[in-house]
Amino acid sequence: MNAPTFPYDTARLSELAQLLIDNVRELAQAGWTPATSSNFSHRLDDRHAAITVSGKDKGRLIEDDIMVVDFDGQAVGRPLRPSAETLLHTQLYRRFPEIGCVLHTHSPVQTIASRLYAPQGHIRVEGYELLKAFAGNSTHEMAIDIPVFANTQDMNVLSKQVDDLLDRQNLWGYLIDGHGLYAWGRDMADARRHLEAFEFLLHCELELRKLRG
């Protein structure tokens, strides 16, 4: 009996699966992926991405919990169910060939910030040294607006809103109201640096808000 063939490099998939498992476990231990929430992906090639399957405890992932989707968000190779939010990953890979990794988490800081700032649609952060953590930035003397999109179960609507903003603004990530944060980068290290920078900056803004009363 012939072994099944797949339209992607299975050895590369195994490498990326382990990379995702190791990094996602650390994020789960930090409390950023409660109750099987969150989803994570890495570009596999110019047509496919490796992504976590839906409904799994992100602190206990195994290789079979990493599946392949095409850039239309459809499962490839195995009949597994991807996250409902897969389109929010694949739209970035399709639009930006340089993006290699997308991370989506649900930390309390991210979720609270998204709720507080949803009415104005963004959170402005400026003057922080850690703004230099974002790729292409070399100074703290700047401001960025972190978008806050309304939550919806219609990923086509949300992905269109994200695309429209990307036409006008350079982004490293965004929040969804009552939901969490998306961050991305050229590889896992880049995406994690952006994710951690957002977490730090959001935490600072929430603390300043409390102190100012």
Curated annotation (Swiss-Prot):
- Superkingdom: Bacteria
Q: What class of enzyme is it?
A: lyase
Keywords of the record, alphabetical order, are:
Amino-acid biosynthesis, Lyase, Metal-binding, Methionine biosynthesis, Zinc
Annotated GO biological processes are: L-methionine salvage from methylthioadenosine; monosaccharide metabolic process
Signal sequence bounds? none
The record's NCBIfam families line, in alphabetical order, gives: PRK09220.1, salvage_mtnB
Q: What does this protein do?
A: Catalyzes the dehydration of methylthioribulose-1-phosphate (MTRu-1-P) into 2,3-diketo-5-methylthiopentyl-1-phosphate (DK-MTP-1-P).
Q: Entry's HAMAP family?
A: Salvage_MtnB
| Protein name per UniProt | Methylthioribulose-1-phosphate dehydratase
Species of origin reads: Stenotrophomonas maltophilia (strain R551-3)
The gene for this chain is mtnB
